[in-house]
Amino acid sequence: MSRPQQAFPPIRDQRGEPHVRRFDEQRWLIDNIIRANGIDWDQPRSLYIHAPCGIEANADFAGIRERVKKMADIGPAFAAVARRREAKANAAALADHKVTARDNFFMAAVHWGAAQWPYDENDETNISYNNKKRECYAKYAALADHHVEAVWVPFKGKAIPAWLHLPPNYTSGKVPVVIAVPGMDSYKEIQVALYGDKFLNRGMAVLAIDGPGDRKSVV
């Protein structure tokens, strides 16, 4: 039995493949959707990015949700909050307020990572946000209430970037390890909570990676 013809057959390119347009060429569509539905138009991104930070970040994300009216607003909105958190962290570090510094370096790293999301090329902005994210997270790691270190996992002649978290009060010996693999819209810096992480609190280590082709793996 023959298949029914499509009412609207795809437009094909010179190779005979369906002609598609790049995301940027259709930006007006997503801008209209964001204007109507907000930053969480397709998934609850502001919620899962917020969650690892805890309640202190409530105002950060409330302000970001209010400011984002189009795709081009996302990066600058998160970057502005990241700068504010980083400045607060640096001031706290100078005053030897280690917990305040630690918490704010963590939140700054989270916001820098979120600011990267709209950029699909390794341009100057994306790379600078990535560097700030890694710098802030390294400063958080130095002050964390458990051991955190940067590691690189060998992969097909290259290496996958990761953060290794050991459970609180770890001294020596083997422990179970959870490998946290974020999706394309996520990143390794939000895979372990600032407080009360469900894996670390159960005595497990966490290896949080950026998968091949994503975030630092690309940069």
Predicted regions span which residues?
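Cap/lid segment of the alpha/beta-hydrolase catalytic domain
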Residues: 171-219
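Flexible helix-coil transition and linker loops at the boundaries of alpha-helical arrays
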Residues: 94-98, 140-143
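N-terminal cap/lid segment of alpha/beta-hydrolase-fold proteins
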Residues: 76-78, 82, 127-171
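Hydrophobic/aromatic side-chain positions at a characteristic register within alpha-helices
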Residues: 86, 90-93, 100
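A structural signal for well-ordered alpha-helices, especially hydrophobic packing surfaces
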Residues: 86, 112-119, 137, 141
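Short, charge-rich amphipathic alpha-helical segments embedded
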Residues: 98, 102-128
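Long, non-catalytic architectural segments outside compact domain cores
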Residues: 2-74
